[in-house]
Amino acid sequence: RTDTRLMAGSVPEPHVVTEAGARYAVHVLRGQNHGLFLDMAEGRRWLREQAAAHPGPGLKVLNLFAYTCAFSVAALQGGARHVLNVDMSHGAIAIGQHNHALNGVQAGARFMAHDIFSTWGKITRSGPYDVVVVDPPSYQKGSFVATKDYARLMRRLPDLLVPGGRALLCLNAPELDTAFLQDQMRTLAPGMVFEQRLPNPPAFADAQRERALKVLVYREPELLLPADPADGGSQ
């Protein structure tokens, strides 16, 4: 356990901070997990921009390992129509619900305080999704170990996504490099296309890039329609 102490003054608990116009409740005296991971700011920006640029009725997003649902707030502020937030921590989900209320975006959000691997049926029936966010802990005793459990998520991605949908894969484990994700994706979801690795915020400059936070974007190919003979098939 890590204790956090103030050197001077006082901070209200919880304290509300602002990022890109969104408000989040944080507990700055609560060890390392304050309620908002600042190094994921580019991931939230990317999702907000995806939601804003999406044509039609708006993105449908699946937010796995949602924690306090910051990704969901960003997506809904960008114009997403629906976000399903799944996390096994009832406490984190409760803070996530509060974050949505702080920003007035409750209408588009749904919350499930369940173990992800025990609730695939509900998750699948609520799909398919335009974007799937996967932001697990690298190690959480009894629930998730990246080296063996990330693969269980990857192989399900093609079935969760609409044609042309995207997956945002996050990994914050210094001992695992980008190749850990890319090699498994080539094996377990070979049809999905790697698009980019998002940069980390300047405030979190990478002294060793492969030991830093890794956030990769993959795309499910568009559905190819059969050719119309009227468009000039065989002569």
Question: Which residues does each predicted region cover?
Answer:
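Non-catalytic substrate-recognition/targeting regions of SAM-dependent transferases
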Residues: 1-37, 45
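Conserved class I S-adenosyl-L-methionine
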Residues: 57-67
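Conserved SAM-binding loop of SAM-dependent methyltransferases across substrates and taxa
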Residues: 68-80
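Conserved SAM-binding motif I beta-strand of class I
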Residues: 82-87
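S-adenosyl-L-methionine
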Residues: 89-131
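Short strand-turn motif at the edge of the Rossmann-like AdoMet-binding core
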Residues: 136-137, 143, 170-174
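A short glycine-rich, Lys/Arg-flanked "PGG" loop and its adjoining helix->strand segment in the class I
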Residues: 150-163
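C-terminal catalytic and target-recognition region of SAM-dependent MTase-like enzymes
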Residues: 166-235
